[in-house]
Amino acid sequence: MGMTAPALYRYFGSREDLLQHVCGDIFTEIAADIHAAIVRAATASGGDMTAELSAACRAFRAWALAQPREFGLLFGTPLPGFEAVQGHGDPDDFVAECADKFSGEFLALFYELWSKHPFPVPADDEIDPGLLAQLVRYRDALGADLPAGAVLTFLRCWVRLYGMVSLEVFGHLHFALDDPAAMFDYTLAELAGLLGLEYPANRGQGTG
């Protein structure tokens, strides 16, 4: 860059401010990659929701594998004294604003799917009361017109996707798998099942 570390602080008020902007830029980069993948899939498939969901998840995995350090900064162990995302929707939090762009790509798919093809979700009285209260709080923060059970399903999908990608990025599948690509396909099939979609057995793209 042709710039010393001290010179960077002429543009940022503190180390945390610098990290916030780095994280925000990274979130914006991921969101752009995912959005482009969704658009390509929608065009190629004529708007098939399974294809769009698969493309979004694959784009997230591909970015994470190509940028493991950046993935670790956003989604790994927080740096001492620094939290990448301070809170959802904080208008004064640059990185939260950028993180919303990232999560918004997945949420937009989820909202579209729910509006076009609602899928079975647990009723409120089938959800643990403590969990239900948290789901309602998160739903209200999103401003989403969804039942709590649908929010639960969204989070279950994210946990599966994030868990699989994290295990692969950080090398925690090496004890059993040299190439986790097919395992990732099984994860996508699980997500599709939760969302009432069919994931064809030949949807996978092989190694890598």
Regions found by a protein language model. Give the residues of each.
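C-terminal peripheral helix-coil segments that are non-catalytic and often amphipathic
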Residues: 104-208
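Alpha-helical structural segments
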Residues: 17-37, 55, 59-62, 73, ...
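Hydrophobic packing residues in well-ordered alpha-helices of helical domains and bundles
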Residues: 50-53, 57, 95, 99, ...
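A contiguous pocket-lining binding segment that forms or flanks enzyme active sites
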Residues: 82-120
